[in-house]
């Protein structure tokens, strides 16, 4: 395999990468003979890195196939590669499995946390000699499966907070139900079993996390949404249509969109939203994974999910940077109560971990048929998530860590209840102490 002269080739590209993006490219190229997973937050420009590498490899004479999970994301990547002077087109995994294509040298895979799915594994078996380069913001699966079966190296980019501080992502205000007991904590494996329960399950049980839709969605948006361009994520198509109708009946231009609509109709609706003709666009997850919607400044989350990937993908739809912008996230599902804050520092790894959910099919079954008001709790209001990095609770946190049991866990929850939603600062004494004593803070 030839050595890539990426410095000379890269200068001729239309796409110009930032320094942090170029560092990720360099790290991929240093391991270009191995399968690499590139991890960087939503909105950090992974698609640009993918398009950059695609042309770089293609110009060196390699056959490169590019894959993305949805038609909308494929179209975005096609446009980006075209803009960069490439004639390559993205492929659908299933159609490629059934097709008769030449064996590629490289597979570039967007939203690569899907790599353990059966269809992707069939693709990898079809092209056993191809080198894989995957891209993901959240390399964690709900079923707990790792990605080490598909990738050899994990290459991690900047944190969310670093990207915010460098004006790559927008800063934000986050509103969550007042019932939330806040950020959860986990313990490394040797501390997991306590009275027959894992700490993760104990935290979830003690925190009061339930699959509900809290507060009045319309009223909250009017009070806290600041009349911003908004994407609403609903638990089902029926619910999405119902929310769009409710907003429209109250004088707010809102539309529903889903994958069953004609392509021309979807494009027209998205175009109207981008032009500002539609204020609120409602969907289930069409405008979620990998979708670039830089016009959105507010996100409404009404879909409870145990999937960290889904939570992060949806929350970040409002985080694209624009000067003077502050994104607003209205978390009616209290997903922050289960997953933690969106700018927490993750310790990503290729290996698997314990499944996040006891009932992984819950959303597909219950929420898919959802048509009842029984899961609404409009007696609760959303409150702004307040961060506290001043070490006020360090001694109590130290005590809880030393206990290392359910009693200690309850102390943590009591602390968080007092402070509403409080996270421990990355550089605080408590953070360092917790890591040293085997705690992962925040939980992934």
Where are these regions (language model features)?
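A short beta-strand element within the Helicase C-terminal
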Residues: 279-283, 289-304, 310, 317, ...
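Conserved pre-motif I regulatory segment
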Residues: 3-37
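Conserved interdomain linker/interface between the two RecA-like ATPase lobes of SF2 helicase motors
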Residues: 154-231
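Post-DEXD/H (motif II) to motif III coupling segment of the RecA-like Helicase ATP-binding lobe
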Residues: 117-174
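Conserved segment of the helicase C-terminal RecA-like domain
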Residues: 317-346
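Walker A/P-loop
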Residues: 33-52
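Inter-Walker segment of RecA-like/P-loop motor cores
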Residues: 67, 71-103
